[in-house]
């Protein structure tokens, strides 16, 4: 990896690049929800007598979990991956990359066949 390019730009799999970009995106309005969940649980454990601490902490946890659920539900690839045990993930990613490479090979072969029949395909000549 080069020192200037982000890992997301160097990932050959666009889905992995999108996941990386989603997980590393930061803004002032949207902070990471996992630390907030742990902080809310810490507040519950060390309650200092405030009456609505429990409700505040649990509502924060519920809100962050809803954000997480919505983010996962919006991506079919994430749903598929999360339906598998974590120890299977590297094998699944490897399999998906092999499938992509096989599709690229088929595409190259089809392009070669078309060029043999119709002549070279030129992007500038295409309508």
Curated annotation (Swiss-Prot):
<dbReference type="GO" id="GO:0003713">
    <property type="term" value="F:transcription coactivator activity"/>
</dbReference>
<feature type="coiled-coil region">
    <location>
        <begin position="95"/>
        <end position="119"/>
    </location>
</feature>
<keyword id="KW-0805">Transcription regulation</keyword>
<comment type="similarity">
    <text>Belongs to the Mediator complex subunit 9 family.</text>
</comment>
<dbReference type="Pfam" id="PF07544">
    <property type="entry name" value="Med9"/>
</dbReference>
<protein>
    <recommendedName>
        <fullName>Mediator of RNA polymerase II transcription subunit 9</fullName>
    </recommendedName>
</protein>
<dbReference type="GO" id="GO:0016592">
    <property type="term" value="C:mediator complex"/>
</dbReference>
<dbReference type="GO" id="GO:0005829">
    <property type="term" value="C:cytosol"/>
</dbReference>
<dbReference type="GO" id="GO:0032968">
    <property type="term" value="P:positive regulation of transcription elongation by RNA polymerase II"/>
</dbReference>
<keyword id="KW-0010">Activator</keyword>
<dbReference type="GO" id="GO:0060261">
    <property type="term" value="P:positive regulation of transcription initiation by RNA polymerase II"/>
</dbReference>
<keyword id="KW-0175">Coiled coil</keyword>
<comment type="subunit">
    <text>Component of the Mediator complex.</text>
</comment>
<dbReference type="GO" id="GO:0005198">
    <property type="term" value="F:structural molecule activity"/>
</dbReference>
<keyword id="KW-0539">Nucleus</keyword>
<comment type="function">
    <text>Component of the Mediator complex, a coactivator involved in the regulated transcription of nearly all RNA polymerase II-dependent genes. Mediator functions as a bridge to convey information from gene-specific regulatory proteins to the basal RNA polymerase II transcription machinery. Mediator is recruited to promoters by direct interactions with regulatory proteins and serves as a scaffold for the assembly of a functional preinitiation complex with RNA polymerase II and the general transcription factors.</text>
</comment>
<keyword id="KW-0804">Transcription</keyword>
<dbReference type="GO" id="GO:0070847">
    <property type="term" value="C:core mediator complex"/>
</dbReference>
<dbReference type="GO" id="GO:0000122">
    <property type="term" value="P:negative regulation of transcription by RNA polymerase II"/>
</dbReference>
<dbReference type="GO" id="GO:0051123">
    <property type="term" value="P:RNA polymerase II preinitiation complex assembly"/>
</dbReference>
<dbReference type="InterPro" id="IPR011425">
    <property type="entry name" value="Med9"/>
</dbReference>
């Amino acid at each position: 990896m080069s020192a200037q390019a982000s890992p997301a730009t160097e990932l050959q799999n666009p889905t992995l690049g999108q996941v990386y970009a989603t997980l590393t995106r930061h803004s002032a309005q949207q902070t990471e929800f996992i630390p907030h969940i742990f902080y809310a649980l810490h507040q519950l454990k060390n309650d200092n007598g405030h009456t609505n601490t429990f409700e505040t902490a649990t509502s924060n946890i519920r809100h962050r979990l809803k954000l997480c659920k919505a983010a996962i539900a919006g991506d079919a690839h994430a749903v598929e991956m999360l339906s598998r045990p974590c120890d299977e993930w590297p094998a699944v990613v490897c399999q998906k990359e092999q499938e992509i490479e096989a599709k690229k090979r088929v595409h190259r072969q089809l392009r070669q066949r078309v060029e043999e029949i119709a002549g070279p395909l030129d992007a500038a000549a295409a309508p």
